[in-house]
């Protein structure tokens, strides 16, 4: 195991751990995003609590974290499996950032950045699936299905998509899926977690990315302050 690989894995975690959603919300709105909206430290909650422009800035940054770390690892001569591990460390850093006491976002945008470099076409199909579901306000199930489909797309349709080293890519996608599911299931407990059965809670968290079925109740349970600061963009 090379020193460069170890350094890049650690760097990936630290870069991933930069909580841009938290930082920009603090700077531009003066709020702790973990206390408002869904409580998620990610672009979607920034859109809800701080506006679309700020949310777009966070989304671009989070996607770039994953993509840049994979590309840099490749430029340094790391093997494909090592590049993927660096990408997974970057996603883990976003989800469990040391700077926020290991309570971060869901890592979807960062995972997209990693996936776009690993296998662009399947990643775009997964993104399209999430967007299609999002049009009907079902983004979380769309993300779940899109990410779950990635290993199958790379494994069974690698020839069609022109994916080399597809077995390694498929294992990388499985890693992304497992990290996503683990993060959803490890969401902090709240008052709603005790209003449903254990089985329903697991289903809701894993598939819907919330503790209860009602999306509107979930995302509006903590409203952001009314006062607005000037937009960053």
UniProtKB/Swiss-Prot annotation:
What protein am I looking at?
Glycerol-3-phosphate acyltransferase 5
Give one Pfam hit by family name. G3P_acyltransf
Report if keyword Cell membrane is assigned.
Answer: yes
For this protein, the Enzyme Commission number is: 2.3.1.275
The superkingdom listed in its UniProt entry is Bacteria
- What is this entry's stated membrane topology? Multi-pass membrane protein
Signal peptide start-end: none
Q: Which GO terms describe its cellular component?
A: plasma membrane
* NCBIfam families noted in UniProt: PRK14417.1
Q: Which SMART domains match?
A: G3P_acyltransf (SM01207)
Tell me the protein family, please: Belongs to the PlsY family.
Extract one GO BP annotation from the record. phospholipid biosynthetic process
Indicate the transmembrane segments per the record. Answer: 3-23, 69-89, 116-136, 143-163, 168-188
Could you list this entry's UniProt keywords, alphabetically sorted: Cell membrane, Lipid biosynthesis, Lipid metabolism, Membrane, Phospholipid biosynthesis, Phospholipid metabolism, Transferase, Transmembrane, Transmembrane helix
Record GO terms (molecular function): acyl-phosphate glycerol-3-phosphate acyltransferase activity
Which pathway, per its entry? Lipid metabolism; phospholipid metabolism
The annotated subunit structure for this chain is: Probably interacts with PlsX.
State whether keyword Cell membrane applies: yes
Q: What does this protein do?
A: Catalyzes the transfer of an acyl group from acyl-phosphate (acyl-PO(4)) to glycerol-3-phosphate (G3P) to form lysophosphatidic acid (LPA). This enzyme utilizes acyl-phosphate as fatty acyl donor, but not acyl-CoA or acyl-ACP.
InterPro entries given in the database record: G3P_acylTferase_PlsY (IPR003811)
The places in or outside the cell where this protein is found are: Cell membrane
State the reactions this protein catalyses.
an acyl phosphate + sn-glycerol 3-phosphate = a 1-acyl-sn-glycero-3-phosphate + phosphate
Q: Which organism is it from?
A: Dehalococcoides mccartyi (strain ATCC BAA-2266 / KCTC 15142 / 195)
Provide the top EC class. Answer: transferase
């Amino acid at each position: 195991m090379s020193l460069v690989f170890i350094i890049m894995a650690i760097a990936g975690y630290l870069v991933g751990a930069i909580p841009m959603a938290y930082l920009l919300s603090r700077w531009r709105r003066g709020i702790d995003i973990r206390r408002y909206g869904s409580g998620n430290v990610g672009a979607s909650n920034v859109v809800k609590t701080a506006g679309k422009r700020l949310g777009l800035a966070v989304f671009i940054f989070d996607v770039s974290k994953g993509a840049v770390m994979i590309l840099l690892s490749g430029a340094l001569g790391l093997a494909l499996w090592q590049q993927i591990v660096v990408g997974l460390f970057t996603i883990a850093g976003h989800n469990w950032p040391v700077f926020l006491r290991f309570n971060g976002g869901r890592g979807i945008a960062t995972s997209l950045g990693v996936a776009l470099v690993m296998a662009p076409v399947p990643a775009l199909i997964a993104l399209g699936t999430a967007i299609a579901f999002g049009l009907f306000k079902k983004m979380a199930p769309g993300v779940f299905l899109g990410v779950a489909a990635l290993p199958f797309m790379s494994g069974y349709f690698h020839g069609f998509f022109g994916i080399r080293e597809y077995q390694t890519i498929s294992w990388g996608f499985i890693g992304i899926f497992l990290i996503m599911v683990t993060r959803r299931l490890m969401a902090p407990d709240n008052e709603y977690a005790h209003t449903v059965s254990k089985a329903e809670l697991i289903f809701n968290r894993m598939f819907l990315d919330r503790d209860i079925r009602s999306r509107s109740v979930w995302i509006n349970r903590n409203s952001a302050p009314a006062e607005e600061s000037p937009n960053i963009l």
